[in-house]
C-alpha cells in the first residue's frame, strides 16, 4: 500500500507499520515475534528521526540553522538503515499485512547500523544540539519567558 507511507513524509515507516497493524487487528492476523521486533525497531527509529527533525526545524525557526543541519544529518542515517532494509530510503513500503516485504538482508549489518546510530551517533547529535541551543543567545532570547504560566 504505497500511498500510506506518503501520508507522513517526516517518518513514513511509522505510518506504513501503523496501517498494516490496524488491518491485522481488524482481521485478527498475528505476526511472528521476529516481525514484531523488526517493526518495533523501525518505528522507534522513525520516532527518533521525527524528533530530530522537529527540534532542528524549531531551532531553524528560532535562528539556529546549524542545529537544523545537525538534526537532519542524523535523520539521513536512519534513511540509510531504511534503504538497507527495504531498498528505499524515503518511502520504504516495507510492511505487508501479516508480515514484512522480506526479511532483513543481513541481520548482523542491521544490528551494527542500529547500534552505531543508538550508541554513537544519536548521543553525539543530541549533545551537540543541546550545546548549540542552550548557548545560542538568539535562541534563548526568543524563547525565554515565552508561555510562562503562573500559579494563578
Predicted regions and their residues:
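Active-site bordering "gate/hinge" segments
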Residues: 1-152
